[in-house]
Every structure is written in structure tokens, then in C-alpha cells.
Amino acid sequence: MPSSARLSVLGLAAALALVLNAHAESRPRYGGAVMQTGPLADLLVDGDPLIRSLHRRAGGNAGLRQLARLRRMTHLLRFLRQTFNQLATRRHEPHIIPLPRGTERDGRGAGLLTAARGALGHWISIRDGAFDRYQVITPTSWNASPRDSAGTPGHWEQSLIGVPVRDPDDPLEIAHVIRPHDPCLVCTVHFLDAGGQTRHRVRLGV
């Protein structure tokens, strides 16, 4: 959740600069810092008064994340109406003008947008008219990123640190923290005791 702007409104130069290495998709960072993305992050950045007020009172808890998912839908409905009205005036124009085969140029490009789960980015480089490299960083990659080379934990791990678990054999609190992020994956969390033995496994996600 960048403090000043959404990922989807970055300029092309800034967008291309985000991809630092081949491992960026597994532990992405923004300016070296851990970020979160999703409806709550979007509404906080957009300055939604209700969400900001509730966030100041109680922080980014599970209930507020669920409310933000519903709240953002009301914003999207208004945006869709505006978009459809604009498209209606240009419905006879082509959506894309393809280049003649063989005239493709070498280059790099990036496409950034806000998907249902948050910031989504696609990066591509073209050489000799063919794809040379392609990379995608999904919203879940931002939120679920593992510790980086500096030892900084990702957003999910930071969210779980210090969460009390009443029953280690039925750690519902872990699910309550992660599921409101709407993870686009299936992950299994292994709980180890002090002796390093697996005590419990929890399957999360879709």
C-alpha cells in the first residue's frame, strides 16, 4: 500500500523500475519496503472517510477488511457507470490497432491495474519480434511474500506476529487473519513444537 498513490497509476518508467530481479514475483517490494494491497489498501489510499476513520480506531483488523471489500463495490459501481457511458460514445472505434506482422519492435512494456484482490502488474520485454521475458506480480504475491534477503517478513507474516492462539490444535485465529485478504492460493501452515516436530497443519485459501 504505497503511501501516496496506487501501483496502477505509476508512470511507465517507475513501473519498469519495479522489476529488480528474476525473483521479484516471489517477494516484491516497493522502494525496498513491504506493502499490502487489496480493497482496504485501495480505500485508505483513496481517502475514503469511513474506512480511514475506522482504521484509525482499530487498525486493519479482519472485520474492517471484510467491510472494505463491500465498500469498494459501491465505488466500483459508480466507476463502471462512468466507464460505460464513455465507451458508449466511442463504440465504433477499434479497441486495438494491430501492427502488421514483421514490424514489431524491440522494447519493454508494463501494464498495471487494480484487480479484485489488489494491485496486479504485468511486465514484458520483446526482442526480434518475440517475447523475450514475461513477468506477472499478483496481489497475493504482494501480501504473501516471504522474507526477503534483508530478513524482512512479508505482510502476512507481520500480521500474524503476536496473534494469540487459544488452541494450537485448532488455530482459528490464523485463518481469521489471513482469509480476509482473499488469498488466491492454497497454502498449508505447519505448526512445530519446541522440539521441531510437526504438531498441526492448517489448510487455507481457495
Roles of regions detected by a PLM:
Residues 1-206:
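Metal/cofactor-centered catalytic core regions of large enzymes
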